[in-house]
Every structure is written in C-alpha cells, then in structure tokens.
Amino acid sequence: MNTIKTSIIALMSVALLGTITFGLIYFDRFDKGKSTMERTFAMIKPDAVAAHNSGKIIDIIEQHNFNIVGMEKTKLSKNQAQTFYAVHKDRPFYNELVDFVTSGPVIIMCLEKDNAVKAWRDLMGATNPANAEQGTMRKLFATDVCHNAVHGSDAQETAHQELTLFFPDLA
C-alpha cells in the first residue's frame, strides 16, 4: 500500500562568491513498501569553508545521489558547539574542538538517501585523513584529525539528535 508523505526540499544556488540562497518547496512522495530511506546530519567545517571547498563538497554530495533536504550557512555559537559535542566533554580534545568549530562559518545539512548514515560516513572517509581512502572527502579536503573538513552522524540515533538540534522540522 502506498502512503503519501509531505516532505520539504531546500532548493539552493551557490554563487561564485560562495553565497548560498534558499527557497522551500513542498512535494508529495509516494513510498512503496519497505524503504531504507533515511536522513543524516552533515557539516562542512570551518577549515573547508575557509579554503573555498564548500561548492566542491556539495557537488560531490549531489554526484553521490544524496538529496539535500535542508542546508544553512551559519556560525555556531559556543553554546551550540558545546551542546553538539557534549559526547566528547570529558575528552582531552573537547575545548580545541569547540574552539575550532566556532572559529568561522560552517555549512550544516540534512541529507537524505537510502542508508544515508552509512553512505555519508563512507563518503567522508576515516577521521584521520592520512588513513582515509582515495576519493573520500577527508582525503581530498582535510589537513589533519581536527581540521578534517566534514562531520557526519555516526548512527541513526545520533543523526536524529543532531538533526533535532539544527533542523527540528526535518528530524
């Protein structure tokens, strides 16, 4: 039996100067049977934004058939970053991570695809770019473990939490 779901898709255009504009469009999607479609949270970190790699990263995301359901260019507050990285609060790198992610603009996204969490993690590559496979985001755009270009949820539950924090209507 088919069900109709109302979904939101963010239409965007990336100008040569890196400006991102948005419009929202609603559409009906017919789901047939059991679906593996899921959503995940993605972030282009300040190092990749500052290096003008955002457009390249977004192009690769689209080439791998992700639907960009929501996107925003923003600068995270210290409070947002602390909440986002709360799981690492007791780790020695926590303060450096918070300082880094608040050091400049980021691009946050809600991505949708079959098995989106795993697909995005595979496309990102290993946290340490030295260990990342050729063709992955981190092999292409990261410089070290901290400045590793992109973030992605590590599980469906984490994706839901991260999407709720930044895109509550899309979680």
Set out the residue ranges of the language-model regions.
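Non-catalytic terminal and connector segments of soluble metabolic enzymes
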Residues: 2-171
